[in-house]
Curated annotation (Swiss-Prot):
A GO cellular-component term linked to this record: cytoplasm
Name the UniProt record assigns to this protein: Peptide methionine sulfoxide reductase 2
Keywords: Disulfide bond, Electron transport, Metal-binding, Oxidoreductase, Redox-active center, Transport, Zinc
Remaining remarks: Present with 799 molecules/cell in log phase SD medium.
Function: Methionine-R-sulfoxide reductase which catalyzes the reduction of methionine sulfoxide (MetSO) to methionine in proteins. Plays a protective role against oxidative stress by restoring activity to proteins that have been inactivated by methionine oxidation. Protects iron-sulfur clusters from oxidative inactivation along with MXR1. Involved in the regulation of lifespan.
GO biological process, one term: cellular response to oxidative stress
Cofactor(s) the protein requires to work: Zn(2+)
UniProt cross-references to InterPro entries, sorted A to Z: Met_Sox_Rdtase_MsrB, Met_Sox_Rdtase_MsrB_dom, Mss4-like_sf
Domain of life of the organism encoding this protein: Eukaryota
Record-listed E.C. numbers: 1.8.4.12
Binding site for Zn(2+): 79, 82, 128, 131
């Protein structure tokens, strides 16, 4: 198998005001994906193909398409695969990035952090601590604490496909 057959491509089109469409492409290596056999992870049979791609294969849903992007309902967001509580709706804020954003997880240890070198500069990937499902990425020092008067200057950029909201 050559190196090109091992690469997968996700293409996202974004329109910027006054400019042509810019195609942003993310490449990742097949070996970075989670195998079905690894770590005794059981994948929920009720997951949609998109949820499987995001949680297991570390894909990213298209921006501004997620079910929870504009949701303001009170509750706790759980992992779509293993049902572990991950984020409180109280920690959700509008970062206008195209994905739901949270400034902290529901409790310490709910998520794990991993270095992601798939794009430059390197990012920090966030995963469910129980099943290892890919949630998204975390960004620090963007100024949200001062801009929106948040307790932390952290943005957890999370795919809606990796979450289920359990309303209060």
């Amino acid at each position: 198998m050559n190196k090109w057959s091992r690469l997968y491509v996700i293409t996202v089109r974004r329109t910027f005001p006054g400019r042509r469409n810019i195609v942003l492409t993310q490449y990742w290596n097949k070996s970075k994906k989670m195998s079905d056999e690894s770590n005794d992870v059981k994948w929920n049979d009720a997951l949609t193909p998109l949820q499987l791609m995001v949680l297991r294969d570390k894909a990213t849903e298209r921006p501004n398409t997620g079910a929870y992007l504009h949701t303001n309902e009170s509750g706790v967001y759980h992992c779509a695969n293993c049902d572990r509580p991950l984020y409180s709706s109280k920690a959700k804020f509008d970062a206008r990035c195209g994905w739901p954003a949270f400034y902290e997880e529901v409790s310490p240890g709910a998520i794990t952090y991993h270095r992601d070198n798939s794009l430059m500069p390197a990012r920090v990937e966030i995963c469910c601590a129980r099943c290892g499902g890919h949630l998204g990425h975390v960004f620090e020092g963007e100024g949200w604490k001062q801009l929106l008067n948040l307790p932390k200057d952290t943005r957890h950029c999370v795919n809606s496909a990796s979450l289920n909201l359990k309303k209060d």
